[in-house]
Amino acid sequence: MLKLTDITWLYHHLPMRFSLTVERGEQVAILGPSGAGKSTLLNLIAGFLTPASGALTIDGVDHTTTPPSRRPVSMLFQENNLFSHLTVAQNIGLGLNPGLKLNAVQQEKMHAIARQMGIDNLMARLPGELSGGQRQRVALARCLVREQPILLLDEPFSALDPALRQEMLTLVSTSCQQQKMTLLMVSHSVEDAARIATRSVVVADGRIAWQGMTNELLSGKASASALLGITG
């Protein structure tokens, strides 16, 4: 279980404050207007931002001040952050060993994830030789191979065309179910959220303004639907 209790981030001396509970294995979408604080929320969970106050626990363990490298969390951004001079295999391998000295078990784990992502025939290529969708598959593989219990997505597929984006969302959802991972995904699209998350959280003005069933948001009947431009 992921639990945030009054986690506060001071943005230009204006506090953003979040309280949220996500069950193990749950898939949750984080929605809201631009600048509302969605990415800030993910960065607080990942440890890239240190809160001014509040508490963050994962499976009952306090991780409020744990550095990102030691948190049981993986995060995937729109900018996939692949190293252009490293091959696909090496980029994925970084998720297992920063020194890229992989033992036989780690090698097999890396190739198993690559097969799952459908990129096992691209392992010797450089990122510059790949399409945008292929690069995001590599970045996702690097996250999954770490086998952390929580996966955070900050609009990683927003630059992809609709068909490819839907394909990636399905791949993420299936992979998280197989590995029993908790998923939190920032998105500007309620339709994308509905494909992957039964529950959604709406962030507005640095607060969680609403949380509930994604389908309720889509129907226009939720109190927060208007924040997303949805009318019933």
Curated annotation (Swiss-Prot):
SMART domains found in the cross-reference section: AAA
Keywords assigned: ATP-binding, Cell inner membrane, Cell membrane, Membrane, Nucleotide-binding, Translocase, Transport
EC number: 7.6.2.15
Residues engaged in binding ATP: 32-39
GO CC terms: plasma membrane
Annotated ranges, domain ABC transporter: 2-230
Source superkingdom: Bacteria
Purpose of the protein: Part of the ABC transporter complex ThiBPQ involved in thiamine import. Responsible for energy coupling to the transport system.
Protein name (Swiss-Prot/TrEMBL): Thiamine import ATP-binding protein ThiQ
Gene: thiQ
